[in-house]
Amino acid sequence: MAKNEFDITSLTPEQRDARLALDVERLLRFGRRHKLIKDLDVLVARNTLLDLLALAAPSEAKPPKEDPETPAALLDEMVELAAQKELFDGAVNQYRINFETRLMGALMPRESEVCKKFRKLYVKQGAKAATDWFYQLCVDTNYIRTAQIAKNIQWNTATPYGELEITINLTKPEKDPKTIALERLQPKSGYPACMLCKENIGYAGRINFPARQTHRIVPITLAGEQFYLQYSPYAYFHEHCIMLHEQHKPMEMNKQTLAEIFDFVGQFPHYTCGSNADLPIVGGSILSHSHFQGGRYVFPMQKADIAVPMTDIRYPGVKAGILNWPVSAVRLVGRSSQQMQNVANNILSAWRSYTDESVGILAETDGTPHNTVTPILHYDETEGYILDLALRNNRTSEEYPDGIFHPHKEYHNIKKENIGLIEVMGLAILPARLKDQGAQIAEILAGQRPNTSREPGDTLAVHADWIDELIAKYGTHMKPQDANKAVKSEIGTVFSHVLENAGVFKQDAAGQAAFVRFMQSVGFKKA
């Protein structure tokens, strides 16, 4: 329940409707103040909201002179009151979320208006002004769930590669049992084809698919291909954006892909842009729709130094080197976009067919390709384009059925999902369960609870081996605050090991020598 001046759970039907009608006026005031609607739009928006909320007439009372940064708390109240009116099944969380989006959709500008405003700002004031406006629109309409994002638990952990950023992801609401039951009864639908398709704009949603009445996208052309720019509703970093292809087609990694990434950063030089790999295990969660991700953020990987400088005499304008990073990566630096792309394509082409059995790298097995890259590009006014190419391999074995270069089983208690683009850049997105589990482990180290992780059915059973290691290292008499810090630090250390698992060239002498051999095969020499 939102924070209100009075308890909205004990209202009479008349009081409830009066409160809802006043909330409509509060939402309209918010919309006007944040330039979502103009004075001429108010009547239409009001009548739309009255219809959605089954209200006969608007409020005669004046709304309080408030100006919240986001409408989240107000929408929470309106959804709760609407649930009390049984306008939807309030016991199903997804219905609450979808109804909230439907309410806010009444204040949304049309897609054509958004695109026109974005393009006008881009032409007259530049890329940054255009994205500033578009991002703020998505915040003001609660499309970007800032209140939920603020619940995430975040910290940094020092490692030999620099500080890694750890996030326990609490943004996406967990499914309640009723939602899960209803999903089983939901008929299969192929519309929209996936969460990224342009057809999501204005979509009403269903029990297993979010409503998108507040969703807007902006067309951009990248290397001759039609893409759309949007923001992520549950952003993992500042101005987390997604560039999706207009067609629902699979992810690819080739010369065209790199050209599209360079074109995007050329048009939006204040944004980082990267792509998930195009193969299972080392790719992201959506391989079926070609897209990139980016944002106005400096990732830990971008702060890493070159460990082994290298040169290719064919491209004197491009600096290169092996990065000091757990996921094996090559860094290229140069001012010429075309030269940078040429070098990057040489590396990609060479890596696709590269085999070095001495370090477990096979380019293919029975015709199935294993090698690909995860590219990350940003622009620096001093140095020019900076491209990091993380080398990936998705081979499996009997010992590692989930992937040889994938989180190993001993770390699955912390991270077992794919190491995608965001993790490669040094930002861990960890499951919500670690919030309570981490706190309980800290209590064990502080002597505030017994270690029952070996008992059948214990909630910490998945961490049993790890807890034994922590007790051996720290004991069980720590100060509570020190225990919490220790657990967070150890989680970060596990993440660094997970990234090392994903590295195709290991951090030992043999692995680094093999990395140099690969670079030499492309045409590089040590500087």
Residue ranges, per PLM feature:
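Active-site microenvironments that recognize anionic phosphate/pyrophosphate groups
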Residues: 2-243, 247-250, 324-326, 340-344, ...
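Beta-rich nucleic-acid/ligand-interaction surfaces
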Residues: 280-288, 366-372
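Catalytic or ion-translocation cores adjacent to nucleophile or general acid/base/metal-coordination motifs
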Residues: 256, 265-285, 294-348, 352-355
